């Protein structure tokens, strides 16, 4: 986990995503209303699935989720919950392998898969990941992640609202303003 790779699995920061349909909505596809034009986010009510999909797609395109993931991964291996989980898994694996009688014809893939299943079934990963999240992610939620997300949403909605307002017609070029009348009566 500390190598910076992976992501997208259970417990991975930023691993969630939108479906293909909602990703299509975020690119300007028409909505279920059949209006034929792109979706205007400013016209959608808060909590609308299309609005959420548009916002998530915008956050992804800005790289916010990747930034959050990198921020958390840089911090994770310094936390006691991670070190504790790593030690538990190391001990579990050592104990499991000590119980195996080695012979050269052993199927290593079967052994590895059996070990993986045992680790998952033990429940230690789920509990350990929950503790890691509470030590790494939770402290960053309100002070780091939420302000960045809110700022990005406000900028996105403001840009969409600005784009939805038609520009005033341009001033006609080459015409002089009307000359003041010179009435000398």
Swiss-Prot record:
Residues 166-185 have a biased composition (Pro residues). One of its GO terms (biological process) is mitotic sister chromatid biorientation. Keywords: Cell cycle, Cell division, Centromere, Chromosome, Cytoplasm, Cytoskeleton, Kinetochore, Mitosis. The keyword Nucleotide-binding does not apply. Coiled coil: none annotated. Pfam families: COMPASS-Shg1. It is found in: Cytoplasm, Cytoskeleton, Microtubule organizing center, Centrosome; Chromosome, Centromere, Kinetochore. GO terms for molecular function: protein phosphatase 2A binding; protein phosphatase inhibitor activity. The keyword Repressor does not apply. Residues 1-45, 160-185 are annotated as: Disordered. GO terms for cellular component: centrosome; cytoplasm; nucleoplasm; outer kinetochore; Set1C/COMPASS complex; spindle microtubule; spindle pole. InterPro entries: BOD1/SHG1_dom, BOD1L1. Residues 19-30 have a biased composition (Low complexity). Component of the SET1B complex composed of the catalytic subunit SETD1B, WDR5, WDR82, RBBP5, ASH2L/ASH2, CXXC1/CFP1, HCFC1, DPY30 homotrimer and BOD1. PANTHER family: BIORIENTATION OF CHROMOSOMES IN CELL DIVISION 1 LIKE 1. Belongs to the BOD1 family. This is Biorientation of chromosomes in cell division protein 1.
